[in-house]
Amino acid sequence: MDQNPILIQRHHHRQNFAQKAPPAPLFLIHDGGGTVFSYFLLESLGRTVYGISNPNFETESTWENGIASMAEYYVNLIKATYPSGHILLGGWSLGGLIAIQAAHILSNDPELKVVGIVMIDSTFPVEGQFNKARRLAFMAETSTSPDMKEKTRKCMDEARIQSREWKAPSWRSSATETLDNHSQTINVQIHDHVTPTCPPTVLIRALDDGSNNSRDLNETSPTETSNDSETQALGFDRYQNFNLRYVVNTPGDHFSIFNKENVKELSKKVKEACDKLVMKS
């Protein structure tokens, strides 16, 4: 983990009339175990992809302010790698929460713009409570050594506390007005010139949640039309002014979505999410 962020996929851009600039890179933040092994299993996403691992994985150090401290540190890593332009942020499980915090930090950055967030089966935590339905995920190599398992377990224990104690950042509200049958989103800036608006976000949700009423695999729902919003949005419907555009199902459960039989479909969903978010920016 010496290289951080580590290059996971390199996109060789060919300039053409339709797309002169290379696609915005995607920075994926580690899972609860602190590693980025799972992201190396993804098929091509059509853009450069970096993985950010937990630098405390090999040490006894902890993060003083949890997710907030992690996000601040990771933002510096991102800026050192990609100082200016448009980027996408994302992550599996805990990584999705850190991505939200990092996007908030970067919201007023004059050089770097977060055009979207891609969360992979992340759950919005209730402060002070541990979510039992979807636990924090991690993925280790199949040849995990006892030492590696112990380090991963340490990160997992910390991640549970960090998730439980996380105070989600505040976002400014946005309003949608319809002009000539075209929906346009405008920022509401009444009495608030400091709080930023949230970048558009896609939540990729594991289809198998352990119940018998799983939805159709190909269903893609704007969150405002979901009849079961809390389940469908994994609690993010409770997050005030959070700009969750779509919830997309992918096969598998929280722990098997990166398995061989599921990762092709997951890769497709992540790629489609990135492409949609960039188009809306």
UniProtKB/Swiss-Prot annotation:
Q: What is its EC number?
A: 3.1.-.-
Result of knocking out the encoding gene: Significantly decreases pneumocandin production.
Keyword Hydrolase in record: yes
- Enzyme class comes to hydrolase
Matching entries from InterPro entries are given as: AB_hydrolase_fold, Thioesterase
Protein family (similarity comment): Belongs to the AMT4 thioesterase family.
Q: What is this protein called?
A: Probable thioesterase gloN
